[in-house]
């Protein structure tokens, strides 16, 4: 029997390797989505918090000076940044539910 016939008779000898590769690709894509989400949260949440506090909350409803509005908005943005970083660190440390690290050889 030639090697060509052996491969044809062997069925799907490459299927487990293909499935394993798809599994790794799926895990990589899931990790990429998670990191991208937290990066966007860390970048955009403080900026949005600053402008929402400044433009809609503090200027509209409170009668305080412009400097105090800017300071309060900046403090709110720093708090929002720390919350986003805390969420990322919590997720990185404790991991997602059901995502146990498993070693496959």
From Swiss-Prot:
Top-rank taxon: Eukaryota
Ranges of the Cytoplasmic topological domain: 1-36, 90-105
Topological domains, Lumenal: 58-68
Residue intervals passing through the bilayer: 37-57, 69-89
Keyword presence, Membrane: yes
Membrane topology value: Multi-pass membrane protein
A single Gene Ontology CC term: ER to Golgi transport vesicle membrane
One GO BP annotation of this record: vacuolar proton-transporting V-type ATPase complex assembly
Keywords assigned by UniProt, alphabetized: Cytoplasmic vesicle, Endoplasmic reticulum, Membrane, Transmembrane, Transmembrane helix
Spans annotated as Disordered: 1-26
Compartment(s): Endoplasmic reticulum membrane; Endoplasmic reticulum-Golgi intermediate compartment membrane; Cytoplasmic vesicle, COPII-coated vesicle membrane
A Pfam entry, by short name: VMA21
Chief place where the protein resides: endoplasmic reticulum
Function of the protein: Required for the assembly of the V0 complex of the vacuolar ATPase (V-ATPase) in the endoplasmic reticulum.
Similarity annotation: Belongs to the VMA21 family.
Name listed for the protein in its UniProt record: Vacuolar ATPase assembly integral membrane protein VMA21 homolog
């Amino acid at each position: 029997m030639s090697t060509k016939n052996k491969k044809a008779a062997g069925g799907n000898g490459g299927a487990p390797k293909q499935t394993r590769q798809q599994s790794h690709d799926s895990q990589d894509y899931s990790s990429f989505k998670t990191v991208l989400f937290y990066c966007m949260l860390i970048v955009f949440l403080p900026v949005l918090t600053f402008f929402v506090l400044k433009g809609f909350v503090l200027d509209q409803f409170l009668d305080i000076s412009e400097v105090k509005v800017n300071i309060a908005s900046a403090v709110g943005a720093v708090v929002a940044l720390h919350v986003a970083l805390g969420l990322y660190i919590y997720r990185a440390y404790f991991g997602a539910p059901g995502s146990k690290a498993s070693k496959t050889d």
